[in-house]
Design a protein with these regions (language model features):
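Short recognition helix of helix-turn-helix/winged-helix DNA-binding domains
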Residues: 1-63
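Winged helix-turn-helix DNA-binding recognition segment
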Residues: 45-106
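Short, amphipathic alpha-helical interaction segments positioned at domain boundaries
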Residues: 108-113
Length: 113
């Protein structure tokens, strides 16, 4: 990879935002990585959908997320469970044999990144 110094007017490559509240959260780094990717997708992707209450969500199988972060689907499932346990992700099964609707949540009082 070719590198260069950062100047006062840098051209940045595509990047993910890692919200600061994740730094002290007691979950594995992979869960933080999954959260950052899903947050980016729900805020910036055409794949995000909106429900009847105006809440944005993603409809993906774990396999798709696993391919994005180069992990196994079971690792993604474990990360999503960790995020659910701390209240940052809510999964809703709409029908059998369909992907979960994955709602990405922010801590109350935090501004949207």
């Amino acid at each position: 990879m070719k590198t260069d110094y950062i100047t006062s007017d840098p051209t940045l490559p595509p990047y993910l935002v890692l919200p600061q509240f994740l730094l002290n959260l007691d979950v594995r780094f992979t869960a933080k990585e999954v959260y950052a990717i899903l947050l980016d997708m729900v805020l910036n992707s055409e794949a995000a959908q909106t429900d009847q209450q105006g809440r944005r969500y993603l409809a993906f199988y774990n396999k798709i997320i696993a391919e994005i972060i180069d992990r196994t689907p079971s690792t993604v499932a474990q990360s999503l469970r960790e995020l659910e346990d701390v209240g940052l992700v809510e999964k809703k099964l709409i029908a059998l044999h369909t992907p979960y609707h994955i709602y990405i949540k922010l801590p109350a009082g935090e501004d949207t990144p």
